[in-house]
């Protein structure tokens, strides 16, 4: 398993992943399918944004199997978004990829916002050094401050 920075040619793969049912169902901000035009605009903006870092997770054969995105949305934290294809889950790949990505960036404060219906993601972030900051009826907010 390896991670690499996104390239322009990754746009279609990310578009396909973001519109998968298993991805949409756990999104906090938008659970509707995204059209390619809106995705292309978003992708171009993210590629040119110094406050965003996106990594493609590849298997040992260099086939893309997921992505990790860090995006600064608040002064103090970079929000974490992870997607891993279904057949690669529960193998420790996401934990390894997250740690690799964290070690490649100069960010020190991370935040994960998780829908309460997504207990698996909540447990994943706890297992990977995040702690509960606060919660409401619909979501948990976990943070990890690297020292």
Residue ranges and their predicted role:
Residues 4-33:
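A short, well-structured alpha-helix characteristic of acyl/acetyltransferase catalytic modules
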Residues 105-116:
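Conserved GNAT acetyl-CoA-binding A-motif
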Residues 6, 84, 114:
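Hydrophobic adenine-recognition pocket in adenosine-nucleotide-binding enzymes
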Residues 126-136:
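Conserved acetyl-CoA-binding loop of GNAT-fold acetyltransferases
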Residues 84, 90-104, 119-127:
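Conserved acetyl-CoA-binding loop-helix of GNAT-fold acetyltransferases
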Residues 32-81, 85-87, 136:
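Acetyl-CoA-dependent GNAT
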Residues 135-147:
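C-terminal "cap" of GNAT-fold acetyltransferases
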């Amino acid at each position: 398993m390896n991670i690499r920075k996104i390239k322009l040619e990754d746009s279609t793969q990310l578009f396909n992943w973001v519109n998968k049912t298993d991805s949409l169902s756990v999104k906090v901000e938008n659970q509707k399918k995204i059209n390619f035009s809106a995705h292309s605009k978003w992708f171009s903006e993210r590629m040119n944004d110094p406050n965003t870092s996106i990594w493609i997770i590849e298997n040992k054969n260099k086939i893309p199997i997921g992505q990790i995105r860090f995006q600064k949305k608040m002064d103090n934290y970079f929000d974490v978004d992870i997607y891993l294809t279904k057949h690669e889950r529960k193998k420790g790949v996401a934990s390894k990829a997250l740690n690799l990505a964290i070690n490649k960036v100069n960010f020190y404060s991370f935040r994960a916002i998780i829908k309460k219906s997504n207990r698996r993601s909540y447990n994943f972030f706890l297992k990977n050094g995040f702690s509960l900051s606060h919660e409401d009826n619909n979501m948990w907010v976990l943070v990890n401050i690297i020292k």
